[in-house]
Every structure is written in structure tokens, then in C-alpha cells.
Amino acid sequence: MKSCGVSLATAAAAAAAFGDEEKKMAAGKASGESEEASPSLTAEEREALGGLDSRLFGFVRFHEDGARTKALLGKAVRCYESLILKAEGKVESDFFCQLGHFNLLLEDYPKALSAYQRYYSLQSDYWKNAAFLYGLGLVYFHYNAFQWAIKAFQEVLYVDPSFCRAKEIHLRLGLMFKVNTDYESSLKHFQLALVDCNPCTLSNAEIQFHIAHLYETQRKYHSAKEAYEQLLQTENLSAQVKATVLQQLGWMHHTVDLLGDKATKESYAIQYLQKSLEADPNSGQSWYFLGRCYSSIGKVQDAFISYRQSIDKSEASADTWCSIGVLYQQQNQPMDALQAYICAVQLDHGHAAAWMDLGTLYESCNQPQDAIKCYLNATRSKSCSNTSALAARIKYLQAQLCNLPQGSLQNKTKLLPSIEEAWSLPIPAELTSRQGAMNTAQQNTSDNWSGGHAVSHPPVQQQAHSWCLTPQKLQHLEQLRANRNNLNPAQKLMLEQLESQFVLMQQHQMRPTGVAQVRSTGIPNGPTADSSLPTNSVSGQQPQLALTRVPSVSQPGVRPACPGQPLANGPFSAGHVPCSTSRTLGSTDTILIGNNHITGSGSNGNVPYLQRNALTLPHNRTNLTSSAEEPWKNQLSNSTQGLHKGQSSHSAGPNGERPLSSTGPSQHLQAAGSGIQNQNGHPTLPSNSVTQGAALNHLSSHTATSGGQQGITLTKESKPSGNILTVPETSRHTGETPNSTASVEGLPNHVHQMTADAVCSPSHGDSKSPGLLSSDNPQLSALLMGKANNNVGTGTCDKVNNIHPAVHTKTDNSVASSPSSAISTATPSPKSTEQTTTNSVTSLNSPHSGLHTINGEGMEESQSPMKTDLLLVNHKPSPQIIPSMSVSIYPSSAEVLKACRNLGKNGLSNSSILLDKCPPPRPPSSPYPPLPKDKLNPPTPSIYLENKRDAFFPPLHQFCTNPNNPVTVIRGLAGALKLDLGLFSTKTLVEANNEHMVEVRTQLLQPADENWDPTGTKKIWHCESNRSHTTIAKYAQYQASSFQESLREENEKRSHHKDHSDSESTSSDNSGRRRKGPFKTIKFGTNIDLSDDKKWKLQLHELTKLPAFVRVVSAGNLLSHVGHTILGMNTVQLYMKVPGSRTPGHQENNNFCSVNINIGPGDCEWFVVPEGYWGVLNDFCEKNNLNFLMGSWWPNLEDLYEANVPVYRFIQRPGDLVWINAGTVHWVQAIGWCNNIAWNVGPLTACQYKLAVERYEWNKLQSVKSIVPMVHLSWNMARNIKVSDPKLFEMIKYCLLRTLKQCQTLREALIAAGKEIIWHGRTKEEPAHYCSICEVEVFDLLFVTNESNSRKTYIVHCQDCARKTSGNLENFVVLEQYKMEDLMQVYDQFTLAPPLPSASS
């Protein structure tokens, strides 16, 4: 049985405490208090409640047989609230956690958030409670606060990798990363969800659909097509999934040119869509797509019928009406086209395509004034992709108008009503009222998805009236309209009659009887239905994900409707979500997500992780405009009125008058951090998907919601003093908040305030650029040695964080201080630990054996108490628990293992996290106080070498590794050492191994200090860098031809610009052209492996001339002790460049140092940021929806300047060596044609080891593989190295201690469970092992599938992934790589060595 976070014993204890509190209250009443009788819980009810927490979310069926459970939860909430009120909030923190769980299960999200907030504020070690973090993540997910939800879910998996709802977490992480366009992370989490055999609210087929759709989103159409077709072969595939898969395949064949010729594609598209409609006849989306297909092959009547069906099924769709308008315009029916376009823009005031088409229609009818108004509205839309072309057209029309005689337009008869008149035409006017009515009808609908759609039910059938048109009459009407210009008088009369009847019929259909016209939640302090706060808007229905793809074929920018997809605790607005303000990006795609606006530039990233008791706006996160600021203040000040925002559709005028603001990027802050949304209403996100609405349509499964729309309410029991609304975060911050953008009462702030103990944090601004370093220069030598001696060993690295992991009371936000304290902190003595034991016992909660039953039915498979559980989760906590941290570093291994056995007997599981619980790692905040602006461009530390003696001068090593120097440039190294750089020239490389593989990155040629989007209109952080492969010979040919082409261009410029100097001409011309775009495409040859000493013997031998501290292999290099090859780290890699080739921003793998030598002949420009600021850059990446660890990003220097981030900037010339210190962030661009060689180095320092371990833990939190196996490396260091630095020794020894305990405890658990452990010793140079599923390092005990073991392929799993795949491990064998006696011997023999008499190079 798996650990599921907080122990049920804790819940039972809370319930028992609740009983004690009740007795006290009863005694108070008996003594004379006159109070109303408060509800009380029986012992049986308290026991039942002990098994209810966030882990049951989505698995409790209130609408089936769970009425008793729902009633019990409601009663418990009333009892808890009553008790807390009477105790004036002075109750145990667990009460608030339980109250949060109960409200979450009842889907009362505002109350759940409020209760979780109080628990968070009261419980200093809240991070140990996985169920709390999970519940908090679910609430954030519900409110579309994706960045918060991601952090909460990641921390659950970090503190408890075996969490029983890990599959639910991976599913939601996959969805959120997909929306954030982090496709690699999304795919990884979907795959992790797929391999988990635990129950989930989505079926595996639905998860496979998400993976297929992810490929489609990435424009990997062949992979997507293959995945969809494979999914159709699944047995017992539900009709909902089948219909959606067929819909996707149909639309892909219509839109993707790669799938065949047009005729074949359209034929397949129509077949797939027809099959989809057979599976789900009520899909308005499929009808719309079918109409588009018919339209593209000229079947006008079929297209009209399909569009009509689409409108009937999915009600208002701006895309459908726009497509109808296009058809009418093609049929030369301008009046009908006008009405259709007006319907489209009333449904979606920002529908750029409809505005442009409408403008074209007016222009064709010679009404330029109306055309200008339409074009202006199109340019105001964020989805408008050709603003410049429209602006030019507007100028042209305005110039024409100026040249016309005055009054000529007024005297001219208009073919069409003006835009203002058209706004009130009968059909559009009725449409808007109809839409409001239909939305209300859907809110009152029962929990009926009708195949996955929230479909409105038709009105009750009434007696047929004379205006009711039969299908025959409707067909006749269409025929008459199609031939309007060729009708005789009788036919024209018939057409008028039929059209009038048609309008009457529409009016009747648009007013369903008994349906309210106003959408409202009726919830106190909650938003209305049109509020920008993303909440559930359909009583009894699941929230939906409405992801809509923008079609890009015949009408760029015309988009489909928005079907929805329900998901347990989906963060998306429920019910049918009209695309009322959806946007397009030219012919690209758009994702609509409920009512929440998420853009690719990171608006969702602006959602802060709020700080407790803070009163100011998020730092560097959100800029409020006045239009958004006021509603927020009003909401906080008015306890009975929610933040109301109009839907901005028909309430807006035709010329862009808006209730709030016509187009500006103002944002509304949601109550209690529910998300930041664009004021235009429905959001968009650039995406590459096709039909994302259909993509996530139908995929609902097993959960039902119960309440309607809800805002965030401050209940009495949840209000902090002063009525300040605080929202919990899973990272706690302390300190004041500098640089807050504004101050609005009630909105917590998110500022990382770093406290004192950050190790290796350089004091910026102090670095000076020394002159020539030479052992013959006594003055300089003294300066250098003084600097080194003052800073190395006795500087910031001397500080060691003594926070006790198990009794953690307050921690700063630096990763250095908390995340890796399990390895990288000094361990307190047993005596000091014992003094804190009483505080730590309650926090070391024993995981429970399983979830209690609900209504007599077990929620998980219970295990017989006679059977020994692998994870030892059946033990109850005992008052005699020995804190794991009381095991000192210094006792022998035998004492350690004896203590481990006691730990097991006392009820601790074998989970490393429970043995050594540490707070999840967090990025450091920006160093405080911030540097003054004149210190943000510091000089780069540079050393000039004259001879070999200078290169081997000992202080050079000390200077480079000094944490105060994030980077050092060693000038003239090649000349001083007489290195033959020609061995690495392109010519020599081709002669040596011309067919050697080269990884190619295709990039855009840009100015070094700028990064523009492909159109050249705005600066962005995302750096285009697409991967492919070639050979050295082919890249050499490209490199040479690029140089020749540049020479030709230079000669042409000289002949055309003789009036100016060459330099002025080139710089000004390039600067202007590059900013305008489109940019020239270049290719960068990167990561060329030079590890083979047979192929590259001469080259590698030449590098042995280097000083020991920068060599690829040396005794003082940690990476030389890994024991196997890590390509590019302890081997050499080569880079072949043309001007503009970019290495995007990054820190080295596991924060190791790096060495880079420029071979030449051209230069490179470097940009460097000190390690202490990586948290700031991580925040910028989050804002821009980029993955700091794995993404491709190029920082905007203006952003860094505003955030007070210092940037070292320098030129690396041929022969210069650049030393990047541990953890330094850097990015590089080639100025000329050049080659570079590089590798990593690990100095034997406490600072390097500490930063490496911190990144190891951060990678684990982020589900990213650590390239350096730190556990494996630490044991090899203990075998090979004598360590004299006490801080480094303690960190390594503690890592050994921790892993020794893990191995012993796991061994004992496996043996007790009857699982055989098979000896499988390590071979020479065998690589360290990683889990094939989650990619964490696996040490000593390898879980290998039976099949791979028999085949000798050895596919390794970690314990947690093995158990998720096979609960009882019956499909796995366990291989042991080290004898416990060997590990004990290494541990005992690793002792602190006496200090060396003097430092050496």
C-alpha cells in the first residue's frame, strides 16, 4: 500500500481533538452560557470523517450512492466552523486542513481555499502534508492559477513520490504544461500518467488522446495521425472519444497539406467527419468542420445545411457565422453576408477575421467609411496578424475619402446599411438575446453531457404555427436565396414571405419559454456568470476545458466553436462556453480556456504564489491598469458584491466602445488569486493544435460537481485580523517587499526575500578587473593572492545552513538554504537534535495503510494485516519515535544500520523523504539590497597571460574558483601555452573525420543584445532553435559558403553606399532591417562529440598542455571521479559557428563549472549573470511560458536592467579561455565565423558540491533528469579522495549516511515482503542508473522488469515507479549492485583528512 501524504492517524487525532473541544464547549454551556445548540458529531461519524481528505476528490459519487457522505461532510463543515468560531480561531491547525479537505470534496472552492490558507499560516512545516499540498493544487487548478497549481503538485511528488494520486497530478500537469506550450514537459507527464496503474478520473484511452493531440499541437502531424488511428483500434473505445478522434482526423485532413493532395484529403476529411457525427450527432464543432469542407469543394448547399446544424447544436459560434458570411458573399448576397458577419462580431467583438471580411464587404459595396471602421476594429483585436497591411489599407481609404468632393458620399445611395444601423438588424439583435437565454438554460440543465457536450435542451414542443418552416420550405428558401438575382416577381414575393416566416421562426427559437434572461450565480460575494473569475458556471456539471483550434485554410483567422471537455476538478468554466471574445493569430491557432485569459507571453505566469499577510501587489509579476485596479478594490471593499465584468460582446458598440476598455491589455485580478485574465473575456493562447476544442471535448470521466458558480468568500472563521485576504502558497516567504508595483489592500504579494544563509552567493559589484597576471609581477601577485585568500574558503561559502530538516521552523527561499539540506547541510549533533525531538514527533506523520471506506465501500484495495506491506505503511506512530536526524554523521556504519532498524520498528516508512524530510527546493530571490543602476554593468574579471609560468601560477586557480567571480576571461592562454588551435579548425576537422555527426540548430540572425519575434514587431524571450543533424563535411561547406556570401553582400553594399563609411552603412542597415523582419535563417553546428580518443587523438593530446584545474581529466576534477563518460561534461565538445549562432541562456548541468576556448578566427560575445540571480531569470521564464531548465530563451537586457540584475558582457577572442564559475547563468552569440571547444570541470570545493546537490534536488522537483548522478559520484569520491575541507566532508558524509539508510531500510522491507534480491555486481565503467520512467537516479537496488531481465536489457525502474506499474512488484526482479558490507566499509573509511600545508594548482 502506498503512502498517501498525511497520516489518517492525524485526521483521526484531529477528529478526537474535535470531540474533546466539543466536551469543553458543552461544559461551558452547562455552566450557564445561553447559546444555540451547535451540531455535534458522533464517534462513528468522527471515525468516518478520518478517512476523508483531498485524495478522494473526483472519486466520491454524491449523485449516486454518496448522499450520506455528502450530508456527513456538510454536517462536519458546520460543526468545524461552529467550533472554530467559538474558539475564536484558537484551534489546532489540523482543523483548518480538514475543513479545507471537506469543502474541497463538497466543491466549495472559496471556502476550501480559505481553510487551506489558515492551515498554511499556522503550520510552519505545511510542506510535509502531501494531502494539503494536493488539495491546494486542486483549488488552484480549478481557478486556472496554473503556475501555483504546478508548484503545489510538483511539491506533492517531491515530498511523497509514491503519493496515491500521482496519476491525477501527472494528468493535470500534462494539461497545464500543454496550455503553457511547454510540450516536452506535457508529454512527459502524460506518459507518466499512462504507465501508472492506479485509478484515475480519465481513462487511459483519454490520456492517449491527449498525447495524440499534443503531437498535433506541435505540428507533428504524421505522429498525431498515427496515434489517432492507433487509438481507434482500442477495444471498447467510448463513443465520446471515438467521435472526437474522428473529428480530429477529419479536420487534420482538411487543413494539413502534408497528408496528401487536396481532392484525396477533402474526401477523407468528409468521411471522417461524417463518421464522427454518427458517433456524436450533436457535435456542433463537427458540423461546422463539415461545412468548411463542403465549402472548400464548392458544395454550397451542403455547406449551408452543415452550418445551420452547427448553429442548432452549439448555439452561438462566431466562427460559424463568419463562415456563413463568406459563403453569402461568394454567392453575391451582400445583405445576408452583412447580417452573418454582424452576428459573428456581436458574439465575439474581437473576431479579427469577421471584422476584416466585413470591411472587405463594405469596400466592395463602395462604402469606405464603414470599411474603415471595420478595419480599425480588426486592428484593435489582439488576434489580428496583419496589422501593418490593414493600417496601410486604412490610410489608402482615408486618402481616397479626402480626395472626394464634399457631400458626394451623402448623396450616394448605399447598398448596405451602415455599421451602426447593421448592429440593430433583426437577426443579430435577436441572436444576442437568444444567446443569453441559452446560456441560462444550460445552467439550469441537469448533469447531462450528451456525449461530452454541454448541450442546451430545446424548448418544450408547442403547437406548430403558420410561420414554422418545414424542411422542404427551408430548402426552397435556400434555393430562392441562391438565385435571388434571377427570380421572377412571383418568386420574389415567395422569397419575401419565406424570409419573414424564417425570421419569426428564429425569434421564437431564440426565446425558450421559462428561461431567465440574466445569468447570475446568486452566491454572496461571488462573481456573476460574466465575471472574469474562472469558476464552475453550471450547477451539477463538471468544469470544462474548451481548447479551440483556429482553422487556417480558405479563411485565415476564422475559427470553430468551443465545445468543452470536463475533467475532474477542471479549472475551466463549465457549461457551453461561447467563443465570444476568442482571438486568432492570423492562420495560427488559438486555445480558449474557460473564461480565463492565458496568453503565450505568460499572462498565466503572472499569477503569483502569494505571500502570507502581505498587502502589496505581486513584485515583477503584474502591472495593473486603472480599469482593472478599481473593480478589484471594489470587490475587496464590498463583501456582498463580486467582481463583475461584462462579456464584451453585444454590450459593446460596433465601433469598439467597451464597458471597461476597448482593447487595452488591462487585466483583472481575481479574488484570492484566482488568476489574472485579460479584460476582453475569453482567452487565447497561440498554439499549433487543430481543433483543440474538439481535442479536449468529451473527455470527461468519473466526477460530478455539485455547486454552481462561486466566488471566493471570506468566511468568519477564515478571516485574518483586519479582514486581510491571504492565500496560501506552497513556498513561504519572509521579509519586506521591495519594489512592489502598487499597493492594493487584500492582495498578497509574492516576493522572495533572501535571508542570510545563502552559500556561495557572490557580493556583486566588488569584482575588479585585475591587470596582467604574472608571477613576475610582485604587486599584481600580492593583489591576486590577497583577493583569493580573502574569498576562497573564508567567504560566503563558509556559511553553513544549520536548519534542522525535521524540525524546520522557518526557512528562507533560497535553494541553498533548504532544498538540499538532506545532503548539503551540516548535521547538528545528536544532543542538539534530541532537544528538539518533542517538536518533530508530530511532524513526522506515519503514512496510513489505505483510505477508509465510504458508505461501506473501500476506496482502495485493502491489504490483510497478516501480509507485510512493502512500504511499511501499516505502522501506527509511536511516542517513542527516534527522529531520523538523530543518527549522527560520525558513528560507525553498524550504529547507523542499527538506528535504521529502530526507525523501521518505530513506524517510519522507507521513503527517503520521510526519513529525511526537507522543504521542497525553491529558487533564490533577488539578492537584497538591490544593486544601484550604475553597478548593473560590472567589468568582467580578466587575466592576461604572457607565458607558461603565468598559466600555472597557483593563485590563477584560486581566482577562477572564487565565488565572487561568476566568470573569468583568461586572455592569451593559447599563445602563452603554445597551443596548436589549428587542430580544431574546420579544415583539420574535415580531414580527420568528415562524416562525423553534427547537431544543427536552425536559428534567426538577430542583433546580439536583442531577440525579436519572427515578424520583428516585439522583443521576446523565446529563442527559435530547431534541431536537425548533418555531418562535419556538410556543415563545413555551409560555413564556407556563408562566408563567401557575406563577402559578396559586403562588396554590393560598398558599391551602393559610397556616400557613407562601410561601418556606418552596415550597422545602420542591419539594425533597421533586422528589427523589421523577416530575419535571415542561419545554422549553428553544436554538441559535436570529441570523446573518441582514437578519432581525435591529436586534438585531445593537445589539451593536456592546459593547467590541471582546467583539464578535461584531473584528480581535482569531481567529474573525473564519476567513473563513466558523460558526453560534453567530462569529454570535449566542439561548436562550429557562423555569425549570429546562439547558445541560449542556461546554467551548466548540475551547476558545474565550464571551460570554453575560442578557436577562431572570429569572436564571440558573452552575457553572464551571477548565480544568485538565477531565481529572477527563472521567474522571467515562467512569465514568458518558458522552461528555465529545458527551454530555449534569450534574456531581454531591458527586463534584466529593470529587475536590477547585473550582466557581465564581454568579447571572447581567438585563444581566450572563458571560465564559467559554478551556477553562473550565461548565453553566447558568435560575432564572426569561428569554432569553440568546451567541457565541464568540478573543482573540489564545498561551494561546487553544494550547488551541484541543490540543482540535483531542484531537477527532481521539476521532473528533469540530473545529468550528473550525485549519489553515485559521492560514493566514488568517498572511495577515491581524501577530503580536508570540513564543510565538504560533512556534506559528502551526510549523503553517504542518507543513502546507506535508504538502502538498508528498503532491503529489509523487501526481504520482509518475501521479495528476492538478486546479486548483479557493477562492471567497469558501467554508467550510473536512472529510472526509465521518471529519470531519477537509482542507486544499489535496481527494479528491473522480468522481461528485460531475461533479455539482459535491464530496463531500470525506481521503487516508486515500479510499484505504480505493478502494485505488488510481481512483474519485477530486484537487482543488488553493492554488498551492504562494502558500502559500510566505504562509509567507515571516509574520514576527515588533515588539511594540506599549502594550496597547489
Swiss-Prot record:
<feature type="modified residue" description="Omega-N-methylarginine">
    <location>
        <position position="549"/>
    </location>
</feature>
<feature type="region of interest" description="Disordered">
    <location>
        <begin position="624"/>
        <end position="746"/>
    </location>
</feature>
<keyword id="KW-0597">Phosphoprotein</keyword>
<keyword id="KW-0802">TPR repeat</keyword>
<keyword id="KW-0479">Metal-binding</keyword>
<keyword id="KW-0560">Oxidoreductase</keyword>
<feature type="region of interest" description="Disordered">
    <location>
        <begin position="810"/>
        <end position="864"/>
    </location>
</feature>
<dbReference type="Pfam" id="PF13181">
    <property type="entry name" value="TPR_8"/>
</dbReference>
<dbReference type="InterPro" id="IPR048562">
    <property type="entry name" value="KDM6A_B-like_C-hel"/>
</dbReference>
<dbReference type="Pfam" id="PF21322">
    <property type="entry name" value="KDM6_C-hel"/>
</dbReference>
<dbReference type="GO" id="GO:0005634">
    <property type="term" value="C:nucleus"/>
</dbReference>
<feature type="compositionally biased region" description="Polar residues">
    <location>
        <begin position="624"/>
        <end position="652"/>
    </location>
</feature>
<feature type="modified residue" description="Omega-N-methylarginine">
    <location>
        <position position="519"/>
    </location>
</feature>
<dbReference type="InterPro" id="IPR046941">
    <property type="entry name" value="KDM6_GATAL_sf"/>
</dbReference>
<keyword id="KW-0488">Methylation</keyword>
<feature type="compositionally biased region" description="Polar residues">
    <location>
        <begin position="437"/>
        <end position="449"/>
    </location>
</feature>
<feature type="repeat" description="TPR 8">
    <location>
        <begin position="352"/>
        <end position="385"/>
    </location>
</feature>
<dbReference type="InterPro" id="IPR011990">
    <property type="entry name" value="TPR-like_helical_dom_sf"/>
</dbReference>
<feature type="compositionally biased region" description="Basic and acidic residues">
    <location>
        <begin position="1046"/>
        <end position="1063"/>
    </location>
</feature>
<keyword id="KW-0677">Repeat</keyword>
<feature type="binding site">
    <location>
        <position position="1226"/>
    </location>
    <ligand>
        <name>Fe cation</name>
    </ligand>
</feature>
<keyword id="KW-0156">Chromatin regulator</keyword>
<comment type="subunit">
    <text>Interacts with TLE1. Component of the MLL2/3 complex (also named ASCOM complex), at least composed of KMT2D/MLL2 or KMT2C/MLL3, ASH2L, RBBP5, WDR5, NCOA6, DPY30, KDM6A (or KDM6B), PAXIP1/PTIP, PAGR1 and alpha- and beta-tubulin. Interacts with SUPT6H. Interacts with SMARCA4. Interacts with PROSER1.</text>
</comment>
<comment type="function">
    <text>Histone demethylase that specifically demethylates 'Lys-27' of histone H3, thereby playing a central role in histone code. Demethylates trimethylated and dimethylated but not monomethylated H3 'Lys-27'. Plays a central role in regulation of posterior development, by regulating HOX gene expression. Demethylation of 'Lys-27' of histone H3 is concomitant with methylation of 'Lys-4' of histone H3, and regulates the recruitment of the PRC1 complex and monoubiquitination of histone H2A.</text>
</comment>
<feature type="modified residue" description="Phosphoserine">
    <location>
        <position position="769"/>
    </location>
</feature>
<dbReference type="InterPro" id="IPR048560">
    <property type="entry name" value="KDM6A_B-like_GATAL"/>
</dbReference>
<feature type="modified residue" description="Phosphoserine">
    <location>
        <position position="829"/>
    </location>
</feature>
<feature type="binding site">
    <location>
        <position position="1331"/>
    </location>
    <ligand>
        <name>Zn(2+)</name>
    </ligand>
</feature>
<feature type="binding site">
    <location>
        <position position="1334"/>
    </location>
    <ligand>
        <name>Zn(2+)</name>
    </ligand>
</feature>
<dbReference type="GO" id="GO:0044666">
    <property type="term" value="C:MLL3/4 complex"/>
</dbReference>
<feature type="region of interest" description="Disordered">
    <location>
        <begin position="1043"/>
        <end position="1079"/>
    </location>
</feature>
<dbReference type="GO" id="GO:0035097">
    <property type="term" value="C:histone methyltransferase complex"/>
</dbReference>
<feature type="region of interest" description="Disordered">
    <location>
        <begin position="758"/>
        <end position="778"/>
    </location>
</feature>
<dbReference type="Pfam" id="PF21326">
    <property type="entry name" value="KDM6_GATAL"/>
</dbReference>
<dbReference type="GO" id="GO:0071558">
    <property type="term" value="F:histone H3K27me2/H3K27me3 demethylase activity"/>
</dbReference>
<dbReference type="GO" id="GO:0031490">
    <property type="term" value="F:chromatin DNA binding"/>
</dbReference>
<feature type="modified residue" description="Phosphothreonine">
    <location>
        <position position="827"/>
    </location>
</feature>
<keyword id="KW-0991">Intellectual disability</keyword>
<feature type="binding site">
    <location>
        <position position="1358"/>
    </location>
    <ligand>
        <name>Zn(2+)</name>
    </ligand>
</feature>
<feature type="repeat" description="TPR 1">
    <location>
        <begin position="93"/>
        <end position="126"/>
    </location>
</feature>
<feature type="region of interest" description="Interaction with SUPT6H">
    <location>
        <begin position="1"/>
        <end position="1095"/>
    </location>
</feature>
<feature type="repeat" description="TPR 6">
    <location>
        <begin position="284"/>
        <end position="317"/>
    </location>
</feature>
